Amino acid sequence: MNTETKSLPAWLDKVRWDDNGLVPVIAQEASTNDVLMFAWMNREALAKTVETRRAVYYSRSRKRLWFKGEESGHVQHLHEVRLDCDEDVVLLKVEQVSGIACHTGRHSCFFQKFEGNVDSGDWVAVEPVLKDPEHIYK
């Protein structure tokens, strides 16, 4: 199905889209269950993700579709799509090409861990940079 020339499929109507026509998406690595990143999708992005078997997100700042890895080469191959119990969050189980999901060059965007207590805690980077972002985005 080409989503540019045909109407979008009816199964998309089950998703509870927000007032802007978006739904939050969590990308999880299929082989390890690591949470890789959080992003947004509109109907077209979700349809293209299923159609191409590659993660396609919607950039709220650029107001356009964002094909994961279009600049970095760090694409996400789709294994499975799930919808949560309230039907307002999508989970993508993916294979992360090159092991880098984050624009900081790390495996996961969730690399900062809170350590300490409510009075004297701080966020600590607990995942290494796998590749310098300067060399990812040229």
UniProtKB/Swiss-Prot annotation:
Q: Which reaction does it catalyse?
A: 1-(5-phospho-beta-D-ribosyl)-5'-AMP + H2O = 1-(5-phospho-beta-D-ribosyl)-5-[(5-phospho-beta-D-ribosylamino)methylideneamino]imidazole-4-carboxamide
Enzyme Commission identifier(s) = 3.5.4.19
GO cellular component assignments: cytoplasm
Involved pathway(s): Amino-acid biosynthesis; L-histidine biosynthesis; L-histidine from 5-phospho-alpha-D-ribose 1-diphosphate: step 3/9
Q: Where does Mg(2+) bind?
A: D84, D86, D88
Is Zinc there in the keyword field? yes
Q: Indicate which residues the UniProt annotation says bind Zn(2+).
A: C85, C102, C109
Q: Which domain of life is it from?
A: Bacteria
Q: Please give the Gene3D superfamilies that the UniProt record associates with this protein.
A: Phosphoribosyl-AMP cyclohydrolase
Record's keyword terms, sorted: Amino-acid biosynthesis, Cytoplasm, Histidine biosynthesis, Hydrolase, Magnesium, Metal-binding, Zinc
Which GO biological process entries does UniProt record here?
L-histidine biosynthetic process
Q: What is its main location?
A: cytoplasm
What Gene Ontology terms describe what this protein does at the molecular function level?
A: magnesium ion binding; phosphoribosyl-AMP cyclohydrolase activity; zinc ion binding
The protein's location, in the record's own words, is: Cytoplasm
User: Entry's InterPro entries?
Assistant: PRA-CH, PRib_AMP_CycHydrolase_dom, PRib_AMP_CycHydrolase_sf
Q: How does it assemble?
A: Homodimer.
Which PANTHER family does the record associate with it?
HISTIDINE BIOSYNTHESIS BIFUNCTIONAL PROTEIN, HISTIDINE BIOSYNTHESIS BIFUNCTIONAL PROTEIN HIS7
Identify the NCBIfam families for this entry. Answer: PRK00051.1 (NF000768)
Instruction: Give the similarity note.
Output: Belongs to the PRA-CH family.
> Per its UniProt record, what HAMAP family does this chain match?
HisI
Provide the protein name. Phosphoribosyl-AMP cyclohydrolase
Q: Which organism is it from?
A: Burkholderia cenocepacia (strain ATCC BAA-245 / DSM 16553 / LMG 16656 / NCTC 13227 / J2315 / CF5610) (Burkholderia cepacia (strain J2315))
The gene name on file is hisI
